[in-house]
Amino acid sequence: MNRYKLKDLSLNKLEYGSGAAACEYDGSTRYVRITDIDNEGNLGEDVVSPNTVDDKYLLNDGDVLFARTGATVGKTYLYRASAGRCIYAGFLIRVVPNQELIRPDYLYYFTKSPQYKGFVQSSMKVVAQPNINAKQYGDLEFNVPSLSEQDSIIEKLKAVSTVIALRKTELLKLDELIKARFVELFSEYEWSTTIGNYIAELRGGKSLAGTEPCKNKVLKTGAATFGWFDPEQYKFLPQDYEPLQEHKVETGDVMISRMNTPELVGACSYVFEAPENMYYPDRLWKVITKNNANPIFIWQLLWDPEIRRQIKEKSGGTSGTMHNISKPKLLEIKCIDVPVTVQNDFADFVKQVDKSKVVVQNALKKADILFDSLMQTYFR
């Protein structure tokens, strides 16, 4: 086992990418930017080209890119030739692994380790936004085992990563099944009513944050952001504050984010199982439905593309990054008029799909725990 600095593992000096502007994809050269790399280390579907192509920034199979600035500083991408001809942008730094010392996959997996994450947190220079420069990355020092041991580690981590990816794909397919069923059942109904026809009240909570652990917790906006309730998105309430019962999160609730980014304002989720002692903040509304509405139907209705378009159109704000929507504007949004009996049939279908999701989520959780355990073992 040897110890190296990152700069000593790269065949080239750690280099910033191209300063070219992005333009429409030319069918030949893709421009890889920070925003194109997702949390799984994959490239997104928004394909663009650089307006000028300089071959010095062309990626070669096995190159590893490091994000040097912005909210995603520290994020990495392992380039493979199967991604096609690519040039990398200036907010990324390239490492060309010396494969006589380190496998590209091993370096990439290292960037998922607790040691690397600790380095990112301790190294960020925050001025207008977080930043880690090439020198800081180059001085990052870590243990590197023999190539044969690296190969063994890579094989095991890839096996678990494959299981994790499969489980995530299963969850996405189940989500798509619900969306497809919604379209199948409701596409023929008239857009002749408003959201207010289904909702009796939009009830906001109270946002307070304690400095110490407390049995009572308040949700963060992120609990509703991506369509599924995330009970891990919370803060502790002050120990001397007694929350109102009407602000409590309950099983069967629909919650709506009244303030978020322009794309996510109005995001909502459904609570299949409420955690104990959890309460609403003022940025999330608890939806009180009328007798003619099924909460699960309302949850899925609010994710309909046309509803999302109307919400975005009616929202606003003084900040370019945060928008909000008022209760009256949300309630006046046009929507389909569906009998509650049909809504209930759809809700029963969603509940059955959710049972399958729980099984997959539990399997995913076990795979995640195994992956984290292996990372702790291999990257000390």
Predicted regions and their residues:
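Non-catalytic DNA-recognition/assembly elements of restriction-modification systems
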Residues: 1-16, 40, 139-154, 169-206, ...
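Sequence-specific dsDNA recognition surfaces
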Residues: 4-20, 35-61, 197-208, 222-254
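Short coil/turn segments at secondary-structure boundaries
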Residues: 20-26, 122-124, 208-215, 314-315
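ATP-grasp fold ATP-binding core
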Residues: 32, 219
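A short beta-sheet element
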Residues: 33-34, 55-112, 246-303, 319, ...
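Short, solvent-exposed loop/turn positions at domain surfaces
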Residues: 50-53, 126, 165, 243, ...
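A short glycine-rich beta-alpha junction/loop motif
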Residues: 85-93, 102-105, 125-148, 277-285, ...
